[in-house]
Amino acid sequence: MATPSAAFEALMNGVTSWDVPEDAVPCELLLIGEASFPVMVNDMGQVLIATSSYGRGRLVVVSHEDYLVEAQLTPFLLNAVGWLCSSPGAPIGVHPSLAPLAKILEGSGVDAKVEPEVKDSLGVYCIDAYNETMTEKLVKFMKRGGGLLIGGQAWDWANQGEDERVLFTFPGNLVTSVAGIYFTDNKGDTSFFKVSKKMPKIPVLVSCEDDLSEDREELLHGISELDISNSDCFPSQLLVHGALAFPLGLDSYHGCVIAAARYGRGRVVVTGHKVLFTVGKLGPFLLNAVRWLDGGRRGKVVVQTELRTLSGLLAVGGIDTSIEPNLTSDASVYCFEPVSEVGVKELQEFVAEGGGLFVGAQAWWWAFKNPGVSPLARFPGNLLLNPFGISITSQSLNPGPFRTPKAGIRTYHFRSTLAEFQVIMGRKRGNVEKGWLAKLGPDGAAFLQIPAEEIPAYMSVHRLLRKLLSRYRLPVATRENPVINDCCRGAMLSLATGLAHSGSDLSLLVPEIEDMYSSPYLRPSESPITVEVNCTNPGTRYCWMSTGLYIPGRQIIEVSLPEAAASADLKIQIGCHTDDLTRASKLFRGPLVINRCCLDKPTKSITCLWGGLLYIIVPQNSKLGSVPVTVKGAVHAPYYKLGETTLEEWKRHIQENPGPWGELATDNIILTVPTANLRTLENPEPLLRLWDEVMQAVARLGAEPFPLRLPQRIVADVQISVGWMHAGYPIMCHLESVQELINEKLIRTKGLWGPVHELGRNQQRQEWEFPPHTTEATCNLWCVYVHETVLGIPRSRANIALWPPVREKRVRIYLSKGPNVKNWNAWTALETYLQLQEAFGWEPFIRLFTEYRNQTNLPTDNVDKMNLWVKMFSHQVQKNLAPFFEAWAWPIQKEVTTSLAYLPEWKENIMKLYLLTQMPH
């Protein structure tokens, strides 16, 4: 099949003007999907002629039938039938309603004749858009490889009929919609036409809200909210970007959990997780959805074998289902989770020709397992869903009640908001609903991840955004001059980042940026830089490998590596500041300032608008060893590795390496801070030896081998997504914490509570964690252990919250209110563990954590996990600790109490003293 660009050139070859009949008022065409594109667009941006493909065939749609019998348009008509005919020499059939067209074609030497019916022997069939008897024949003709030239307008038809839903009832749309082209009841302006030298853009927005309102009402009948509070799942956020797609459940940030769409003659409903198919509270919605998808046919509902629970929920509502491993030929509705690329085309045709598809899937786990690969581009579910105008993102949503759109109240939609953004940017005035521009930025950045090459529906948005950003200076967000996220300037930051990541050369579009992440004074090395990167990863997850290189902002770099390494699932990453700030109210930096991509070729190009340190991401269990990586367009950054970098080399790095960020590394910890801070560090060795002692203590308490299989990372940033610091890979902290990381004297005197707290968070395991009670508690065991065993700082001085009078008061307050595990959180919960440690030492904890690591099939709910902890700790210390934990109001099961009765009583149980001296409540 020819590319859209080549097809447009063929259709417009020799066409120098659009001499359309003045008395023929056309209608605007709506284009959706990935195959359709405009050919003729008026001065108002309305599409009046469009083309597409379906199956093996092709389609040209003209927005008034009189255009097809206008002799002045002969050059275009000849091009059209020539392009449509995939079998050279095959005859052209013309429906009697367009008989003059046959004469026009014959007069130009084309074998054309009037045919009342479409036949397989024809190469092209020409017909008006009002025929109601040949719908299925025309679709099958096109699908088998025939070309279809069809013309008509729907505004007059709509005025004469009772059914106002033109998109779904107009006869022509029952044919052309399978290929993504719809006749609308919007009149087309004919005052000015321009013959385009290149393919025109598809409009961002074509008004069709009225056609979808009934669908929304039917889907949400009797439903005021979509409550998944107790579903125990985190659904993916859906990106609703199609003109005929619409959200059904939104959170307070306009994040969508369930959406629906029309596509061709069929319908689609998507949920952000397959678990939502099993949520009892969603039962009424699930019934509505299946009935809507069926479209009144009362046809066969097929449920994928893995989703058999849904079958039971539907049966309660009187809907019979058939449980099958795959889609069947007689299905009306198919409910399933897409897990592979197999059958995508068949499923899309199933919907286009009238089927209903009910999809449940999340993409965040796939994204975690495939770093550097966009789920919008490669996740199997999105290969299916992108053309429908709904995509599943890697962003998760919190489970909870989701509001449903209400009639008469505007609801956020990517396309309508983008259209308003375009107007505001052009006129410098306008008013968008609160929160919409804050949502537009990340949604636009996500949309731009969908592969757009030779797909006009996506390229049109790219072209629009490039045009907008080339006109207006990109704002610079700093702490001194923050950018409000929910405004055009905030949206521009996300959209510009998305454009850069999609491959646009932003050096032509945006001015040089000067902030913490990108300096206009950085000039890349004139010659390529080759570094040896250790690409062995014995860990159980991917890891970043530092290169000691920095990439200036807006710089397109070229990365080269050996052929063998190009097939080893390596990725490249520019930037280390991974926090997503798209939900921040104010921005001190761009909301997303890193870029990742696969190193799947020996030579690869990548850019990042903001610049950043360069990393190679190595997958788990990689055994590649040292790999030479050559980079064009980089500069050196300060880098010190304990045991490898000499003091003389470090001093030279600080003086000569211009990168604004640098790293201090051991085999167990890597600190990433601004170069300005590193210049105050004359000799990093004593500091890093202390950090290695800290990491050894962290590993010892957590029963981990040392040296660590992979080093932990701590990265300083001007703004982070949550809190003062937060755990993860990497641990993130504010710039104000840099001295706490790199000042050895300060660490030894004041301690290191914050960073070790986050290192402790990374040590927590779900097997012995009882969220939310211990989330901010057990991690502090590492703080106490490190401060006392490495830094020599007693717990009472390490944190004011552990001063003995404060601890005692906290316990008494807890008991005075009536001990209840609901109130057992944070410092109060930590006290339980500290009492055990002060009585039995650290060794029982270390042995216990070792035992947990070696066990399998452990419980997952809090009550069972807490009872297992009581049993295991009691066995470790050979004391019956059930009374101790009961005093703390743990839900100790009777069988556990009985099983521990043989152990000696713990007579020193400090909770006895508290209970004896506690005032009655």
Curated annotation (Swiss-Prot):
Domain of life: Eukaryota
Predominant place of localization: membrane
Pfam families recorded: M60-like_N, Peptidase_M60
Single Gene Ontology BP annotation: positive regulation of protein targeting to membrane
Keywords: Cell membrane, Membrane, Transport
GO cellular component, one term: plasma membrane
Domain Peptidase M60: 542-841
Transport keyword on record: yes
One GO molecular-function entry: transmembrane transporter binding
InterPro entries (alphabetical): Class_I_gatase-like (IPR029062), M60-like_N (IPR035423), Pep_M60_3 (IPR042279), Peptidase_M60_dom (IPR031161), TCAF (IPR051244)
PANTHER family listed in its UniProt record: EXPERIMENTAL AUTOIMMUNE PROSTATITIS ANTIGEN 2-RELATED, TRPM8 CHANNEL-ASSOCIATED FACTOR 1
Quaternary structure annotation from Swiss-Prot or TrEMBL: Interacts with TRPM8 (via N-terminus and C-terminus domains); the interaction inhibits TRPM8 channel activity. Interacts with TRPV6.
Family indicated by similarity: Belongs to the TCAF family.
Recorded domain comment: The C-terminal region is necessary for the channel activity stimulation.
Designated name of the protein: TRPM8 channel-associated factor 1
Source species of the chain: Pongo abelii (Sumatran orangutan)
Gene: TCAF1
